[in-house]
Amino acid sequence: MNVILEQLKTHTQNKPNDIALHIDDETITYSQLNARITSAVESLQKYSLNPVVAINMKSPVQSIICYLALHRLHKVPMMMEGKWQSTIHRQLIEKYGIKDVIGDTGLMQNIDSPMFIDSTQLQHYPNLLHIGFTSGTTGLPKAYYRDEDSWLASFEVNEMLMLKNENAIAAPGPLSHSLTLYALLFALSSGRTFIGQTTFHPEKLLNQCHKISSYKVAMFLVPTMIKSLLLVYNNEHTIQSFFSSGDKLHSSIFKKIKNQANDINLIEFFGTSETSFISYNLNQQAPVESVGVLFPNVELKTTNHDHNGIGTICIKSNMMFSGYVSEQCINNDEWFVTNDNGYVKEQYLYLTGRQQDMLIIGGQNIYPAHVERLLTQSSSIDEAIIIGIPNERFGQIGVLLYSGDVTLTHKNVKQFLKKKVKRYEIPSMIHHVEKMYYTASGKIAREKMMSMYLRGEL
């Protein structure tokens, strides 16, 4: 992480008293941050550390300090999620042979565990930033490599979408999430203030942004956070931009932003932990159902097309990750096959959903995400997912799970959709739920919702 560390050193010299971190009620200047990193380096130097060191801490401030201190010691941080169940932590430590884990009580060293990632293996991945994990929505989270050059390329295109007066970046999610860690390093590398939270709280986040009168804030959020924020938002002049990522923004949120925060610069990103950014929609210039236009340094193709021209999205760019741990390296000139299906029409990218979410009903491919987006345009539906359950005649049938104040009939849903989708795309059954359950990254937990529905718990 040579470039980002040098940039941080420059900011410490040129503006030592500027606020680098504003986490909850704590503010830390660039000079103070440097001193705390130096202190952490001195503490960690007492130990014989292995090449990869896991960080599993509840405190964002301590996590940031440890992350940067490990880089000064030329170690690779592995960012773990503090909210994972202890069984998941143990399984991951065992699977990847992690011998050193920095937790809330200090450094824990597993001397007896076999080391899976060693210095020889890391030679194939120069200039690593960290080892991260996918969201793990369908199983055990998967470890991947992220190098510095890829995020420096992302910073460059991201900067083009920032407003000139934005001097602070807020990302209230956990640092183990790619979006939050990205926003942190983007802020520190560019000499801005990073605003974060231990636990997302919309009112407290707005209060943080108001606390320093000079703040002009760009917020990096997932759609569920934007939805919560709009419930307490009231002409917040310190907030300049919403950068939304992690899932498609529903049209209902677009409408709320237009009504409540029309002066906000709204940028919707589409990307993944592995690919980083793929496309963007600036201030709704793209059709609302699309995820915008490709970034200039991204190439895209689709393969394995169905009869509707929908295919698997493949990406090539200099913002790509370096590969999964234990698998082959990924180079910038190689095509990476995503788990997303979609198509490009008139330069705009449209997503039809993840491959594992696709339903096959009577031999027809059904992409729930497309129908779900249409359904959330109804004022009666807040959120919606369509799950597939086994059916003897058709193989599967679609079941709509939706939240909202209005209880709908199947006839209501059929009437709303009949001119928008094909007949076989209309869910066969509907079920109203009091609330949706979410993954740690803010997406609807489809697997959990389906399991609960099948067990009669919704």
Swiss-Prot record:
Keywords: Fatty acid metabolism, Ligase, Lipid metabolism
BP term (GO), one: fatty acid metabolic process
Membrane-spanning residues: none
Gene Ontology molecular function, alphabetical: medium-chain fatty acid-CoA ligase activity
EC top class named in words: ligase
Domain of life where this protein originates: Bacteria
EC number: 6.2.1.-
Keyword Lipid metabolism: yes
Miscellaneous remark of the record: May contribute to vancomycin resistance.
PANTHER family, alphabetized: ACYL-COA SYNTHETASE, MEDIUM-CHAIN ACYL-COA LIGASE ACSF2, MITOCHONDRIAL
Protein family: Belongs to the ATP-dependent AMP-binding enzyme family.
Protein name per UniProt: Putative long chain fatty acid-CoA ligase VraA
